[in-house]
């Protein structure tokens, strides 16, 4: 899929071990497949973010895994149970992917699409207030 890659995101990914590069590149592709209008940026000096009408997700490589932070993940259904952390956080959730683990791309794409839809509807604060 063709998209405008932020060279700072490329630099971040290129500096990682091969197995983390592969994970980050796959998550990046999934984010752009979720909606062609998703853009990339870097926040907090080095952390890659995917945004569309608000934050959608961010990447952070750790020693033995890659974290995918889902913004407003607290109101996104997770029927396949791919979220691994953040259940005590009011809004964000996290998926940790370790070397050799398969990414559930269809489930992650659906989550990205739901977060984007929520962003377009005004974000989690507006959606929670309406409940």
Cite the ranges covered by each PLM segment:
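Charge-dense, helix-prone N-terminal extensions
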Residues: 1-131
């Amino acid at each position: 899929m063709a998209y405008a890659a932020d060279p700072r995101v490329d630099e971040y990914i290129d500096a990682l071990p091969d197995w983390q590069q592969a994970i980050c590149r796959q998550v990046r592709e999934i984010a752009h497949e979720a909606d062609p209008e998703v853009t990339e940026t870097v926040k907090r000096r080095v952390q890659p973010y995917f945004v569309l009408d608000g934050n959608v997700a961010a990447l952070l490589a750790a020693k033995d895994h890659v974290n995918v932070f889902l913004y407003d993940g607290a109101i996104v259904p997770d029927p396949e149970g791919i979220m691994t952390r953040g259940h005590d956080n009011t809004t964000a959730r996290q998926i940790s992917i370790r070397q050799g683990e398969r990414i559930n791309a269809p489930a992650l794409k659906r989550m990205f699409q739901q977060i984007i839809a929520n962003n377009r509807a005004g974000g989690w604060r507006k959606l929670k207030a309406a409940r």
